[in-house]
């Protein structure tokens, strides 16, 4: 699906910019010179949320209350409505969306809001085999204060498929990206891991990529068939805090995680 795969970048005061997939992995960290770091603090706060195409009331108040203090906001099913774009450009230096498919008015897909400009951006898409609709993912890279580069993967996994072949296929190019990156990684989003086979495929992928799963003490994540759908995986970082915000502003509850960029725990 590379032909129709691209990201749209929204920056305050500038026209939206279309970004095509990079030609090679060699461009990771070389596409742009590192600018301001993602965080000047000793912590990185992220919010991960399937925002349900902003179909419910209060989604904006949730973002304003919990997203504005985050260095990264990873949204799934984000529609580029004027309200969302205005919030993103007013509170973040960059907002990158990968349109999975175009709805009557606004494209919908994963969207990453960041407190720093990414030095690398790779949009990805995979088509649902049954509904023929696409799901998207986005790989971005940001400089950290310690000169390392943080890779961030925002993913909305395919939902309706027989078996796990297409599910695993969507993870393959993400694995290629991680394999060519030596720094810390955060991979998060709606993984639609509602079956045992999907969970096993996801956990196997995480192990192969040396990614650890963020654990939530009061685990109020959205579930299907008793299994959580939303996850945060990481490497090269420490988890300081992790919580789930219970809200009716979407059919998913946002995940709030704070990382410290020091050396990870053994």
UniProtKB/Swiss-Prot annotation:
Main location: cytoplasm
Cystine crosslinks: none
Any one GO CC term of the record: cytoplasm
Subcellular location: Cytoplasm
Keyword line: Cytoplasm
SUPFAM superfamilies in the cross-refs: DNase I-like
Molecular function via GO: catalytic activity
Assigned protein family: Belongs to the UPF0294 family.
Protein name (record): UPF0294 protein YafD
Protein source organism: Shigella dysenteriae serotype 1 (strain Sd197)
């Amino acid at each position: 699906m590379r032909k129709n795969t691209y990201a749209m970048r929204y920056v305050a005061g500038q026209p939206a910019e279309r970004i095509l997939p990079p030609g090679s992995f060699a461009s990771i960290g070389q596409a742009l010179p590192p600018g301001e770091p993602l965080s000047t603090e000793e912590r990185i706060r992220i919010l991960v949320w399937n925002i349900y195409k902003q179909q419910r009331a209060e989604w904006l108040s949730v973002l304003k209350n919990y997203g504005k203090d985050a260095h990264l906001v990873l949204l799934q099913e984000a529609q580029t409505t004027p309200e969302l774009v205005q919030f993103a450009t007013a509170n973040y230096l960059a907002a990158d969306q990968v349109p999975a498919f175009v709805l009557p008015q606004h494209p919908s897909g994963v969207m990453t809001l960041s407190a720093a400009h990414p030095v690398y951006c790779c949009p990805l898409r995979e088509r649902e085999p049954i509904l023929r609709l696409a799901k998207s993912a986005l790989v971005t890279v940001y400089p950290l204060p310690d000169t390392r580069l943080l890779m961030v993967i925002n993913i909305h996994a395919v939902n309706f498929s027989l078996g796990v072949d297409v599910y695993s296929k969507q993870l393959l190019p993400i694995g290629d990206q991680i394999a060519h990156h030596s720094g810390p990684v955060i991979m998060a989003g709606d993984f639609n891991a509602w079956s045992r086979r999907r969970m096993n495929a996801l956990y196997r992928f995480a192990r192969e990529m040396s990614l650890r799963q963020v654990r939530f003490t009061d685990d109020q994540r959205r579930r299907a068939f008793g299994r959580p759908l939303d996850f945060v995986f990481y490497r090269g970082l420490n988890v300081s805090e992790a919580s789930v915000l219970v809200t009716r502003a979407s059919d998913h509850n946002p995940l709030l995680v704070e990382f410290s960029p020091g050396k990870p725990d053994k």
